[in-house]
């Protein structure tokens, strides 16, 4: 069985080689499974694509994609999914925090009959800022896009081929990958995995990038529209009540200057 591993790469010229090599070694321990890699360089500022080309020359099962500018992690993954041909598709990071040694747990869980499995980190090695932003993202996906109850999403996942086939039909730019997963299937599970510390460098997610990602959630929900409708209804009702109050006051107090009541009604 072929397993495609899609990795978005950004400024990872040193870690991507080790990530691929450790994954290759891990698959040697899994009889009946083969792997292919789709490495997507998201316009890195270092020699990441040179490392990808070197890996392509070393391994015939490695595909390299070089994006013309920085499109962001989710768009980079989508680009890679278009070239993934496996029966299962795994998404993971390039920094070894989503460690290849945990892949057998993902495969074992999806073999139980699930369409999509997210790795759930029992204890994370993230810093305070990353933990905070992850909690915000969880809140948004739960309350705005109806994430299945009890499911913890992460960047380490495995899905069936039909899930990939459905997702790649989405052609818009501002995408939030997890939402597309939730729209495709509800047969989702978690499996607890170990989260490893970053071996070098720091997270490439700035607050600006995270904010843009969160705002992309608005493309998939009617919650803002419902809130705007509710607010509009409240304002309209308040205006009617105010106009009635002004009209009644005018009737009870004819001495109010001419034009005041009509002006107040217009303002309400």
Segments the model singles out, each with a brief description of its role:
Residues 176-268:
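Hydrophobic helical membrane-anchoring modules
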Residues 12-28:
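Short, well-formed alpha-helical segments that are part of the catalytic scaffolds
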Residues 63-69, 73-83, 88, 97-175, ...:
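Acceptor/aglycone-binding surface of glycosyltransferases and processive sugar-polymer synthases
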Residues 2-4, 36:
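Cell-envelope/extracellular polymer assembly enzymes that use nucleotide-activated donors
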Residues 41-50, 96-97:
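A conserved acidic beta->alpha catalytic loop
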Residues 14-18, 46-55:
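Acidic helix N-cap motif at the loop->helix transition within catalytic regions
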Residues 31-43, 65-66:
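Short beta-strand/loop segment that forms part of the nucleotide-sugar
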């Amino acid at each position: 069985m072929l397993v495609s591993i899609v990795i978005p790469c950004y400024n990872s010229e040193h870690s991507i080689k080790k990530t691929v090599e450790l994954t290759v070694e891990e698959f040697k321990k899994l009889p009946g499974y083969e792997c292919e890699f789709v490495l997507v360089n998201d316009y890195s500022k270092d020699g990441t694509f040179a490392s990808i080309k070197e890996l392509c020359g070393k391994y015939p099962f490695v595909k390299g994609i070089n994006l013309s500018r920085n499109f962001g992690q989710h768009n980079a993954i989508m680009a890679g999914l278009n070239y993934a041909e496996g029966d299962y598709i795994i998404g993971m990071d390039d920094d070894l925090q989503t460690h290849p040694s945990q892949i057998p747990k993902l495969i074992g869980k999806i073999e139980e009959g699930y369409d999509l499995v997210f790795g759930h980190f029992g204890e994370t090695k993230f810093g305070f800022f990353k933990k905070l932003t992850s909690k915000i993202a969880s809140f948004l996906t739960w309350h705005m896009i109806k994430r299945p109850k009890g499911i913890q999403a992460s960047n380490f996942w495995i899905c069936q081929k039909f899930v990939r086939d459905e997702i790649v039909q989405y052609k818009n730019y501002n995408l939030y990958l997890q939402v597309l997963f939730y729209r495709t299937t509800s047969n989702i599970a978690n499996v607890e995995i170990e989260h490893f510390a970053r071996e070098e460098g720091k997270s490439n997610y700035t607050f600006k990038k995270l904010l843009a990602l969160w705002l992309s959630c608005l493309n998939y929900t009617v919650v803002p529209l419902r809130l705007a409708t509710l607010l509009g209804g409240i304002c309209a009702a308040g205006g009617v009540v105010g106009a009635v109050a002004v009209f009644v006051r005018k009737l009870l107090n004819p001495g109010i200057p001419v034009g005041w009541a009509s002006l107040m009604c217009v303002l309400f």
